[in-house]
Swiss-Prot record:
Name under which the protein is recorded: S-adenosylmethionine permease SAM3
Keyword vocabulary terms for this entry: Amino-acid transport, Endoplasmic reticulum, Glycoprotein, Membrane, Phosphoprotein, Transmembrane, Transmembrane helix, Transport
Topology of the protein relative to the lipid bilayer: Multi-pass membrane protein
Extracellular topological intervals: 104-109, 184-186, 241-266, 324-360, 428-431, 497-509
Family in the record: Belongs to the amino acid-polyamine-organocation (APC) superfamily. YAT (TC 2.A.3.10) family.
Gene name for this UniProt entry: SAM3
Pfam family, one: AA_permease
Length: 587
């Protein structure tokens, strides 16, 4: 029996199994609360693999995609969760503090760098959204690479991407401790690491709902803080506020200037900080398997444009007008969570007596941002580990899912990495994390490149197999050209980072300086060939377009019904005023 292709009886079975993951286990209801809690950690009995799956005539990739599409996640995320995760989920220390390191390269270099990375990020999110809405499988875009490009490339992307989140977790825990130390330096930072570690781990044991509700609340705080800063910043630029010396405008763009010298090298230097600021913007697409409605994913992806335009570009312009790039405080921070190096604090503290109050306020915002990133680290890494286990690229124990849809082994591995946060008590902490981050430093650009390439390959496969673009659940606003632009931009960003690593700004070239930023390149090459050697496949370095699986796990089960619904929706939008049409296009 063909158990994987669209339109057959087993597809109905797959749909029933996937949808039933939100139904509680009846056998647990009669027990005590403690027993129900205990039993909830047992392996899910809802994820049933058909006995004839392994014996079917389908390809190995089709079998893997079926498994990824039928993982027993709970579909509980609503539109409000996804909207706030998309808007505020990536507003972290990269923006609130890391922006200062980029500003030291000049306001024009900062703006150009953020525009380039922001454009790249918009292309990436649109490409990932198209694939995630079409194939809402475990691991999302990280596993789509294996489906549309090559399994070894997919393994390299997924492992490096997961490693980046795993390493970020203990680093952000240390950030929580150091942020608290701004108010109280008498308590050992390791105590604060322990408190936040327990809080984050317990929070993730509440499942995806605990993650989503926490992110919803924290994102609101961050968004409000950004809006407050934008309003105050505009007033200060116009010459308002206490201790005002008059209209500022673009004063600092002329003196000390728009670019620090050397211009090109400083421009390339902004790419790293910009990538750090935008990193995780694609996280909302990872929730596709736990979302109530796929359309909520597409709407959240459309909001990326406004998030980039308002929260990043507008903020960058205001910061560039309020703080000169040669302000020594920009590079005076003792660590990546030092509030004194925040350009937000520097800009507002120039108002005089407000300085101390502003520092306290921004420290609260930064603490909220760091806790939010910690939460995202455990969520993202645990889901990626589970997907790698389900696809057979990691030991099968990694795919363990309990009855509440929690990837417990993935959460446990994240927790194990979190223990590295106690290195805050060591004098070698900075050096250790410098080299840990070097393991995945450039992997963000590589991951983004592969996401865009996956969308291009998806469109090419549709054409090669005589299929129409009309069956795409959500089409990227930029189409396939957005994927092409994303690939080009990310390739240029990788080249720029390699260049500035080989010839760093303000210091001589050295192997140590180069590998601090580019160690991930040889690491990825080794991982790629190690996986290919393990598979013993040296004949096929990419999947042929005609052989790409376009059916397994596809959200469009009834093509004719889907087309009718799309046509009705288009007719409804066509009957609305022009402003509504614009709203639906961008939101």
């Amino acid at each position: 029996m063909d158990i994987l292709k669209r339109g057959n009886e087993s597809d109905k079975f797959t749909k029933i199994e996937t949808e039933s993951t939100t139904i509680p286990n009846d056998s647990d209801r009669s027990g005590s609360l403690i027993r129900r809690m205990k039993d909830s950690f047992k392996q899910s009995n809802l994820h049933v693999i058909p006995e004839d799956l392994e014996n079917s005539e389908q390809t190995e990739q089709e079998k893997i995609q079926w498994k990824l599409a039928s993982q027993p996640y709970q579909k509980v995320l609503s539109q409000r969760h996804l909207t706030m995760i998309a808007i505020g989920g990536t507003l972290g220390t990269g923006l609130f503090i890391g922006l200062g390191y980029s500003l030291a390269s000049g306001p024009a270099a900062l703006l150009i760098g953020f525009l380039l990375v922001g454009t790249s990020m918009f292309c990436v999110v649109q490409s990932a959204a198209e694939l995630s809405c079409q194939f809402p499988v475990s691991g999302s875009y990280a596993t789509h690479v294996s489906r549309f490009i090559d399994e070894s490339v997919g393994f390299t992307v997924a492992t490096n991407y997961a490693l980046a989140w795993l390493i970020s977790f203990p680093s952000e825990l240390i950030g929580c401790a150091l942020t608290i130390s701004y108010w109280n330096q008498t308590v050992n930072p390791a105590v604060w690491v322990a408190i936040f570690y327990v809080f984050i781990m317990v929070l993730n044991l509440f499942g995806v709902r605990g993650f989503a509700e926490t992110e919803f609340a924290l994102s609101i705080i961050k968004v409000i803080a950004i809006f407050i800063f934008i309003i105050i910043g505009i007033v200060l630029i116009a010459g308002g506020g206490p201790n005002s010396t008059g209209y500022i405008g673009a004063k600092y763009w002329h003196d000390p200037g728009a670019f620090a010298k050397p211009v090109f090298k400083n421009l390339c230097n902004t790419f790293v900080s910009a990538a750090f600021s935008f990193g995780g913007s694609e996280l909302v697409l990872l929730t596709s398997t736990e979302s109530k409605n796929i359309s909520a994913i597409s709407r959240a992806a459309k909001g990326t444009f406004w998030r980039i335009a308002i929260f990043y570009i507008t903020t960058v312009v205001i910061i560039g007008c309020l703080v000169p790039y040669n302000d020594p405080r920009l590079l005076s921070g003792s660590n990546s969570e030092d509030v004194s190096a925040s350009p937000f604090v520097i800009a507002l503290s120039n108002t005089g007596s407000m300085g101390a109050k502003v520092s306290n306020f921004m420290n609260v915002v930064i603490l909220v941002a760091v806790v939010s990133v910690c939460n995202s680290c455990v969520y993202a890494s645990s889901r990626l580990i589970q997907a790698l286990g389900a696809s057979g690229q990691l030991p099968s124990v990694c795919s363990y899912m309990d009855r509440k849809g929690r990837p417990l082994v993935g959460i446990g591995i994240s927790g194990a990495f979190g223990l590295l946060g106690f290195l805050v008590a060591s004098k070698k902490e900075d050096e250790v994390f410098t080299w840990l981050f070097a393991l995945c430093s450039i992997s963000s650009f590589f991951t983004w490149f592969c996401i865009c390439m996956s969308q291009i390959r998806f469109r090419m496969a549709l054409k090669a197999q005589g299929r129409s673009n009309d069956e795409i659940a959500y089409k990227s606003i930029l189409g396939v050209y957005g994927g092409i632009l994303g690939c080009v931009l990310n390739a240029l960003l990788i080249a720029g980072e390699i260049y500035v690593s080989a010839a760093p700004v303000g210091s001589p070239s050295s192997a140590e300086a180069f590998f601090e930023y580019c160690l991930s390149i040889p690491i990825m090459i080794v991982v790629y060939f190690a996986h290919r050697f393990y598979r013993r496949d040296w004949k096929h370095f990419y999947i042929k377009r005609s052989e790409i699986d376009l059916d397994t796990g596809c959200s469009v089960e009834n093509l004719e019904l889907f087309k009718a619904q799309k046509e009705a929706e288009e007719q409804l939008i066509a009957s609305k005023p022009f402003y509504y049409k614009i709203y639906r296009f961008w939101c």
